[in-house]
Regions:
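Active-site regions of oxyanion-processing enzymes, predominantly non-cytosolic
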Residues: 140-141, 145
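Active-site-proximal alpha-helix that buttresses catalytic centers in soluble enzyme cores
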Residues: 21-120, 139, 159-188
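Short, surface-exposed amphipathic charged segments that create phosphate/polyanion-binding patches used
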Residues: 122-129
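Short, well-ordered beta-to-alpha junction loops that form the rim of enzyme active sites
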Residues: 90-93, 147-151
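...with weaker cross-activation on analogous glycine-rich loops/strands in unrelated enzymes
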Residues: 134-137
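Sec/Tat signal peptide C-region and signal peptidase I cleavage site
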Residues: 14-20
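Sec-dependent N-terminal signal peptides
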Residues: 4-14
Length: 188
């Protein structure tokens, strides 16, 4: 009987520890999020250089070493918490594509509806229209990661995340909630 009690206590502790280490799942469930918006990882600077060319990464603001590490850490956080995405989409900007690659959590594809309209390189209304069509047609049972820019996330959610920041979003009722990994994972 003593061993049975010890085993029950042990399993109870393991179960509680596992559950406590996955607050992102609780937060996703709270709002029935089917989208996780992520701002691209750290890419020092502001906007893009004057010679910006979407087809040339050298003409863009790119991830630095800290940004690469940040993207890898976010990817590890998702893996550790067993977050599986039905789709991973990225802006066509190199810093967003590279964020997806460095996260190493699955294949990603680019989507024009996530491109930055900050400096007028693309038309804001075209981007938001494409994104809204995509969001309106998502299944409530899916979970899609969208790696994009501060201006796009703020336009949809009214929240401005930092580099590498995560916003949970329910595309059906338009509920958004910021999730700060640093509040839950001491490795950040």
């Amino acid at each position: 009987m003593k061993h049975l009690l010890s085993i029950l206590i042990l399993f109870g502790s393991i179960s509680q520890a596992s559950y406590a280490s996955q607050p992102i799942i609780e937060k996703i469930d709270e709002i029935n999020a089917n989208v996780i918006f992520m701002r691209h990882a750290l890419a020092p600077g502001f906007g893009d250089p004057i010679n910006f060319n979407l087809q040339d990464c050298k003409s863009q603001r790119n991830l630095n070493d800290a940004g690469i590490e940040q993207a890898q850490n976010v990817g590890q956080f998702f893996l550790k918490n067993k977050i599986i995405f039905t789709e991973i989409l990225s802006s066509e900007w190199c810093r967003c594509i590279d964020t997806a690659l460095e996260m190493n959590i699955g294949a990603s594809s680019t989507f024009e509806g996530l491109n930055s309209f900050f400096q007028g390189h693309v038309n804001k209304s075209d981007v938001i229209k494409k994104l809204n069509i995509k969001l309106d047609n998502l299944s409530s049972k899916s979970l899609i990661l969208m790696i994009t820019h501060q201006v796009v996330i703020a336009e949809i959610t009214s929240i401005s995340p930092p580099s590498g920041g995560i916003i949970l979003y329910n595309s059906k009722n338009k509920t958004a909630k910021e999730f700060k990994i640093t509040d839950y994972d001491q490795n950040f």
